């Protein structure tokens, strides 16, 4: 079985992290976002993953070729010369996707969840039509485009954009299974699968919705990235608690790479991820943060709701909060306060940032 993952965007919502690394390779809970998806696909029996790429494609190709042998699957690149939306990439990869009559997965690369791929295959084969989409329930459907479907069969009747009166609380979760016949519906041009292809399929009775059980998050922007981390760590607590850290100073769900080092009298957690080579010095407090590879947090600093990029250096007695994001290789000098700062890569911060802003 095959899968196409849409990884061609510029990752603008996740800047400054994506200024130096393509978004699919940004580490989420100590593993690239893309690798969470590819490993789950391989475990579900997918043997060929196609990446619809454009921005920084050479970096992606190098990394995924290294993973190809480890996972024992084929990974191909489909290069977009111009942005093709969410349906155009399927037309571009038509020859690869239609090599067999088997249905194939299509994934949005921003999504993190429990990835129920085997259940999706069973659901798709059971109803026997052209398309299946995964849907998830939300508390405020008026903020989203919602899916209106039959409760018992899942057959989709229509899509409603940001409804002001309640019609459904289910939204598109960004994961699909499609039969090769769908490729005949798509031209090689910029096209939205959600707005131009799916509504027609729904009218023809060819599209069904399967409801996702468990957590789901689009982690394409920093505040949602942190929320997604919290949900992922809670899922680990329930399913693989042995992967989480415990011991003196560890509070709640905390994921620590074996090569990371934590000093004395620290308070780490709840909801913290520390990547490979991270050093946390004595007396540091970290809550609801992710700290990426080879970063160092010096003594007595306090971090809450932050993303600390690769190889950053945070000084002593620093306070950072309110979705502060440090790009790669940022230095924060001692005794500073950063409130909602977004700092571009390779910057040195010498004064406090009391109000949210971008540091260029």
From Swiss-Prot:
InterPro entries: GMPPB_C, GMPPB_N, Hexapep_transf_CS, Mannose-1P_guanyltransferase, NTP_transferase_dom, Nucleotide-diphossugar_trans. Residues 245-360 are annotated as: Hexapeptide repeat domain. The active site is at residue 162. Changing residue 219 to T: In MDDGC14; reduces catalytic activity. Changing residue 330 to I: In MDDGC14; causes protein aggregation. Changing residue 287 to Q: In MDDGB14 and MDDGC14. Coordinates binding with substrate and required for enzymatic activity. Keywords: Congenital muscular dystrophy, Cytoplasm, Disease variant, Dystroglycanopathy, GTP-binding, Limb-girdle muscular dystrophy, Magnesium, Metal-binding, Nucleotide-binding, Nucleotidyltransferase, Transferase. Changing residue 357 to H: In MDDGC14; no change in protein abundance; shows an increased propensity to form punctate aggregates; reduces interaction with GMPPA but not with GMPPB. Its EC number is 2.7.7.13. It is found in: Cytoplasm. GO terms for cellular component: cytoplasm; cytosol; GDP-mannose pyrophosphorylase complex. The N-terminal substrate-binding domain adopts a Rossman-like fold and has a binding pocket for GTP or GDP-alpha-D-mannose. Substrate binding is coordinated by an Mg(2+) ion. Belongs to the transferase hexapeptide repeat family. Catalytic subunit of the GMPPA-GMPPB mannose-1-phosphate guanylyltransferase complex. Catalyzes the formation of GDP-mannose, an essential precursor of glycan moieties of glycoproteins and glycolipids. Can catalyze the reverse reaction in vitro. Together with GMPPA regulates GDP-alpha-D-mannose levels. It is linked to Muscular dystrophy-dystroglycanopathy congenital with brain and eye anomalies A14: An autosomal recessive disorder characterized by congenital muscular dystrophy associated with brain anomalies, eye malformations, and profound intellectual disability. The disorder includes a severe form designated as Walker-Warburg syndrome and a less severe phenotype known as muscle-eye-brain disease. MDDGA14 features include increased muscle tone, microcephaly, cleft palate, feeding difficulties, severe muscle weakness, sensorineural hearing loss, cerebellar hypoplasia, ataxia, and retinal dysfunction. This is Mannose-1-phosphate guanylyltransferase catalytic subunit beta. The lineage of its organism: Eukaryota, Metazoa, Chordata, Craniata, Vertebrata. The gene is GMPPB.
């Amino acid at each position: 079985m095959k899968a196409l993952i849409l990884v061609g965007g510029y990752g603008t919502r996740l800047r400054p992290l994506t200024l130096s690394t393509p978004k699919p390779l940004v580490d989420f809970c100590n593993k690239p976002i893309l690798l969470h998806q590819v490993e789950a696909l391989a475990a579900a029996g997918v043997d060929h993953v196609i990446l619809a790429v454009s921005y920084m494609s050479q970096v992606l190709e190098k990394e995924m070729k290294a993973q190809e042998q480890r996972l024992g699957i084929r990974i191909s690149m489909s290069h977009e010369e111009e942005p093709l939306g969410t349906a155009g990439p399927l037309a571009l990869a038509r020859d690869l996707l239609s090599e067999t009559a088997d249905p194939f997965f299509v994934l949005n690369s921003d999504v993190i969840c429990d990835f129920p791929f085997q259940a999706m295959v069973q659901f798709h084969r059971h109803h026997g039509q052209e398309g299946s989409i995964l849907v998830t329930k939300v508390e405020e459907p008026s903020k989203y485009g919602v899916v209106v479907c039959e409760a018992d069969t899942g057959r989709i009747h229509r899509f409603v954009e940001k409804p002001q009166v309640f019609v459904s609380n289910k939204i598109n979760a960004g994961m699909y299974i499609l039969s090769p016949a769908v490729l005949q519906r798509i031209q090689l041009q910029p096209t939205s699968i959600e707005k131009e292809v799916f509504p027609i399929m729904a009218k023809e009775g060819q599209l069904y919705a399967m409801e996702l059980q468990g957590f789901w998050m689009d982690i394409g922007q920093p505040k949602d990235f942190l929320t997604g981390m919290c949900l992922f760590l809670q899922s680990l607590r329930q399913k693989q608690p042995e992967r989480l850290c415990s011991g003196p100073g560890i509070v709640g769900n905390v994921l620590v790479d074996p090569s990371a080092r934590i000093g004395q009298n620290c308070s780490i957690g709840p909801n913290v991820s520390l990547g490979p080579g991270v050093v946390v010095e004595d007396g540091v407090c970290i809550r609801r943060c992710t700290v990426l590879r080879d970063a160092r947090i010096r003594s007595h600093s306090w971090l809450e709701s932050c993303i600390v990029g690769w190889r950053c250096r945070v000084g002593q007695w620093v306070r950072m909060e309110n979705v502060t994001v440090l790009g790669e290789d940022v230095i924060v000098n001692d005794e500073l306060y950063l409130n909602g700062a977004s700092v571009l890569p390779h910057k040195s911060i010498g004064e406090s940032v009391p109000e949210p802003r971008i540091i260029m």
